[in-house]
Amino acid sequence: MNLGENATINVNNSAKAASYSKAPRGLYATSRGAINLAGGASITMAGNHSNESYAISTETGGSVDGSAGGRFLIDGDLHAAGATAATSSLPQQNSTITLNMTDNSLWSGASYITSVSAGTGVISLQMSDATWNMTNSSTLTDLTLNGGSVVNFGHTDGEPWQTLTINEDFTGNGGKLVFNTVLNDDTSETDKLKVLGNTAGNAFVAVNNIGGTGAQTVEGIEIIEVAGNSDGTFEKAGRIVAGAYDYNVVQKGSNWYLTSFIPAPPDPEEPDPVDPDPVDPIDPDPVDPDPVDPIDPGPVDPDPVDPIIPEPEIPVAPPVTEQQYRPEAGSYLANNYAANTLFMTRLHDRLGETQYIDMLTGEKKVTSMWMRNVGAHTRFKDGSGQLKTQSNSYVLQLGGDLAQWSSDGLDRWHIGAMAGYANSQNRTQSSLTGYHSRGQVTGYSVGLYGTWYANDADKTGTYVDTWMLYNWFDNKVMGQEQATEKYKSSGITASVEAGYSFKLGENERNSYWLQPKAQVVWMDVQADSHREANGTRVKDDTDGNLMTRLGVKAFINGHNAIDDGKSREFQPFVEVNWIHNTQTTSVKMDDVSNDMRG
């Protein structure tokens, strides 16, 4: 539709103007011609700026007015070219495009403004419940983003990053800008919003990470540049993550940046001093004093005074600033730790409650089958101290002896098989960002064990216990506002434990024991390398841990007087252990490692 020479046409919401690749323009207003769009329009233009084919184009003072609002479906570019000079009867007039996109409007294209000596083109855009998929760097005169409106910066590999330039003012009323950024350090490539005038209101920012692995920033990645008054605010629409880091949207001066750095808190403001209201002085009546004889004091030696040495000023330390670690790191750590420790046992975890008295012979015996049920709670912090993790776990293990024998009639050998099921749930919270993450581990184990007692009758003297398990797990990490991540882990755990039981004394009903012991456990359950939905590569960075335990246990074997002649016995105990690990549970997210601390 071409219009010119001071002509005017009104298009209501039932009309649709269309053009195709063989025509240069969809809507074209020139020479002070005006097209008024009441209620929106559907315009398709297969061409683009490169071949001067536009969905809407105005030149030499032409105008397209869609300010009344409506549903626009625009596939193509916009172009406002210059102005028409004033004449003896008409004023100078800019070429103008005004659109108020509402009601799920959709525009896919770019916006271009050119200038001539007579003036500059004008493209004014207001969006409410509308989407603009920007296909190339664009220029607008002004932009208002109301609620439900989205501007999506486009990006194609190998193509330049896009810039949206606003020649005058930007106003945010709850709309959203979606940038593409390589989330790394300050030098990262990114799309940008450049406002040559002022900003006002509030808008949201979302970021598509284009291959960034996360890095420590100093100033940050500049995404919004404001030349005028920067009164508008921008806040992130959701989490912005890359690698091990969370990024924030922060203002520095007039501009806005993406930063993984926690900025230093501002200096406290000192209140302005308040001048008290002046008070007129009171002039008392003069009083004649009574005469007093003068006193002639004798000489007085002053007491010596120690010189005052001023305290040196203590320099004020600069405020502490930190990088923001993602809480998902804590969930990966908790999952890896659980996978290596859920099925770890000591001898008496398996056999401590399996002794019984044969009712026919009165002999103490050991059952060939055993079952272990354990619930546990664990807490830890990560290496940065920012992430606090709590986990709850449940373990069920079943086992039984396959063979028992004695080599000398006094000792006893046991060989058996065991299997287990375990589940662990954990939750990590960041003390800096407040974001949280949840983890889950569910898995099984199968293996063999062997035990030797030097004295099977009363278990005095030396014992040696060993076991080996194959373990496999399904793991989940569910970060706040992130996709659920699933991965597997598997590997071997094995143990050798030895101890010696001393009988310290006994009386009618009780015997008193001391048992020093040592245990070495090999832990090598490894998680599969995993790439998150956001592109972060996660790797279990723990290379086979050897845990050593040295301890001593003091216990009593006995029964109450009311249980004389019965098989009920109790075994209260106190145990102290020293534990050492050759490796710390560690996870690497892209190039950043984090580990598990106490």
Features from the language model and the residues they span:
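Interface/linker segment at the passenger-translocator junction
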Residues: 181, 209, 219-226, 235-391
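Transmembrane beta-barrel architecture of outer membranes
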Residues: 22-24, 32, 53, 61, ...
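Structural signature of outer-membrane beta-barrel domains
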Residues: 376-378, 422-426, 469-475, 521-527, ...
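Outer membrane beta-barrel transmembrane domains
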Residues: 447, 524, 537-598
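Extracellular beta-solenoid/beta-roll
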Residues: 45-47, 59, 63-198, 202, ...
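Residue-level detector of the transmembrane beta-barrel scaffold of outer-membrane proteins
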Residues: 77, 110, 178, 368-372, ...
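Outer-membrane beta-barrel and related beta-rich outer-membrane complex signature
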Residues: 219, 385, 427-431, 476-480, ...
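Outer membrane beta-barrel translocator domains of Type V secretion systems
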Residues: 310-508
